[in-house]
Amino acid sequence: MKKITKSLLVMLMTSVFSFSTVTAGELSVTGGVTATWGMGEDSSGLGVSNELDFNASGELDSGITWKWQTQLDDAGTVNDDTSLVLGTSFGNVALMISEGGLASKYGYGVGAMGPGSDYSSTAAVNHGINIDSYNNVQYHTPAGLLPLGLTAKVAYAPNLSDVQGASAKSKGAVETAAVGSDATHYRVDASPIDGLSIGADYAVADGGANERYKQESAGAYAKYVTGPITIGFSRSGYQPFEAKGAANTVGAISYETDSYGIMFAVNENLTVSYSEENSTKRTSSVLGTTASRTAAVESEMEMQHIQAAYTIGGATLGVAINDTDNDGYTAGKQSKQTIFSLAIAF
């Protein structure tokens, strides 16, 4: 299946790049500034974001459209995310440099400021692979081709050791195969009825050095919008890479995460939301060095998110409160974080 996927992507790229004349496009710059005051239990900090998008688009003489974007949204001033998307009658082909995430973990879409831990969290939630962690090539089916609003996307990353911000003529980094040599990511979405969005994704990394378990993940979501109310649910599962010969005193580790919530637009200016993320880390039992079997262990991290956003003029005032039990999958560890923000787009 992986060979077929790679062959199709190569064929599509070859056919798309068979052109001679390019119609000049226009360059635009968009962005925004967000000022924040974040407070933890024992800390406090101020910050101002650095977010600029450079965009250009045009059309080839063959009728193929193109769209280029590069972003400056890192702490430094280097381009860290870049994409080139070519639009054809048979779908879009894209070259993504640290872009084009296909994970469905935040598809449930509940959050006045942003979905759950995607906006703020006191600890990392192990949802699994997302292809935008790597430089990749993608194919997207055209809109309206399939019934029920169904769309499909596939992405392939040929080198998992490659770096973000790669420029033209980059030969890539030497592949260490620490968690895999290459990765493939699939995603489908549909809108079967008005207000309902559903979708799922699956990702796998192959060719890891001395591989015992592949790194793979899967997820699914559903979101329903009716009037001012949005409700959503998502589930993701993740199996990290594990090499052969790993210490046999610890079993295989896996993660399963449920995210759900509700959002209410009080009026055209004010939106409030509440959501939860429950992530379980499982360690399987294993036959130890003394021929005795260790016990299987489960640890559950629970996050609660309360958010509000108020739009006034061209600015958005926001507050996001994140309360976590068993922070970092550590039993008994509790953490809390509050972020006040002012965002202005330009």
Where are these regions (language model features)?
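Outer-membrane beta-barrel proteins
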Residues: 2-346
